[in-house]
Amino acid sequence: MSDNKTSLSYKDAGVDIDAGNALVDRIKGVVKRTRRPEVMGGIGGFGALCELPTKYKQPLLVSGTDGVGTKLRLALDLNKHDTIGIDLVAMCVNDLIVQGAEPLFFLDYYATGKLDVDVAAEVVTGIGEGCIQAGCALIGGETAEMPGMYEGEDYDVAGFCVGVVEKEDVIDGTKVAAGDALIAVGSSGPHSNGYSLIRKILEVSNADLNEELNGKTIAAHLIEPTKIYIKSALKMIAEHDIHAISHITGGGFWENIPRVLPQGTKAVVDGNSWEWPAIFNWLQEKGNVDTYEMYRTFNCGVGLVVALPKEQAEQAVALLNAEGENAWVIGEIAAAEQGEEQVEIR
């Protein structure tokens, strides 16, 4: 073997371990700010340890995982990475609250072809902010630099969350009955769903992202982070007999509301009970999207739909609004015939 042969390193192959270590140093403060008393140890171990909160008698663990879809492409195009982490946390923890679970801890996965420490630190800082809003601890994650797998400095993110709920307090939809009221909790925009259609609308309409709509640019409307409902929803759950909660994500009203309804019931939604936020009207007009498809793809201004006894509805709405949400009665539960659609929008 020749002594003149070049000695290759991992960095020569496109993986910079030093950059990864620099990122870990940058995010230690973010992780610390999210800490809960149940968390044992710090980041950097092979696994993270977390005790169950002592207030639970028969705790059930509830888990969820999600990403932010092609909203990432918009963030990359706008070079705006500081809120995409909030979206990531929101998509995971809002799924947990559907079953009444309090989020305990969160882990993230960040994959890229070439690690840009500044961009990654922005993303993780957003994840930390999302965890603070949700009251859960960021206890670990994985940063994968994978040359040849992603174009340039493109990246993808995924989140994993574990929460806890008292066994007797699980919200599973079995108590939903005809006569229940339906409450809507407003969204902050499209959240993290429908962005492939949004990007197609932008393409075919040749829209200007700097165009102003209600005092904000179209870009600002579309990159607005997903709302995290945990703290207000937990308070509502503690004070009211909640029968079901639906998180309006991909599939919109038609797909998500039936997921929490028992057979023989349907949700009757009053389409006149709210006005769509302006960005949804803009998207519908620019893309010539029919109303059925809008409700199938987007949340149309509704992030959560809650079923509860009719006599508790107004108090629950008042509580949510006092907590800073925009909530209103959106409809009711009715009996459904066999084979009938479980969502009706009037």
UniProtKB/Swiss-Prot annotation:
SUPFAM superfamilies in UniProt: PurM C-terminal domain-like, PurM N-terminal domain-like
Domain of life, per lineage: Bacteria
Any single GO BP term: 'de novo' IMP biosynthetic process
Entry keyword set: ATP-binding, Cytoplasm, Ligase, Nucleotide-binding, Purine biosynthesis
Catalytic activity entry: 2-formamido-N(1)-(5-O-phospho-beta-D-ribosyl)acetamidine + ATP = 5-amino-1-(5-phospho-beta-D-ribosyl)imidazole + ADP + phosphate + H(+)
Pathway: Purine metabolism; IMP biosynthesis via de novo pathway; 5-amino-1-(5-phospho-D-ribosyl)imidazole from N(2)-formyl-N(1)-(5-phospho-D-ribosyl)glycinamide: step 2/2
Subcellular localization: Cytoplasm
Main location: cytoplasm
GO MF term list: ATP binding; phosphoribosylamine-glycine ligase activity; phosphoribosylformylglycinamidine cyclo-ligase activity
EC numbers on record: 6.3.3.1
Database matches in InterPro entries: PurM-like_C_dom, PurM-like_C_sf, PurM-like_N, PurM-like_N_sf, PurM_cligase
GO cellular component: cytosol
Family: Belongs to the AIR synthase family.
HAMAP family according to UniProt: AIRS (MF_00741)
Name of the protein in its database record: Phosphoribosylformylglycinamidine cyclo-ligase
Species annotation: Aliivibrio fischeri (strain MJ11) (Vibrio fischeri)
Protein encoded by which gene: purM
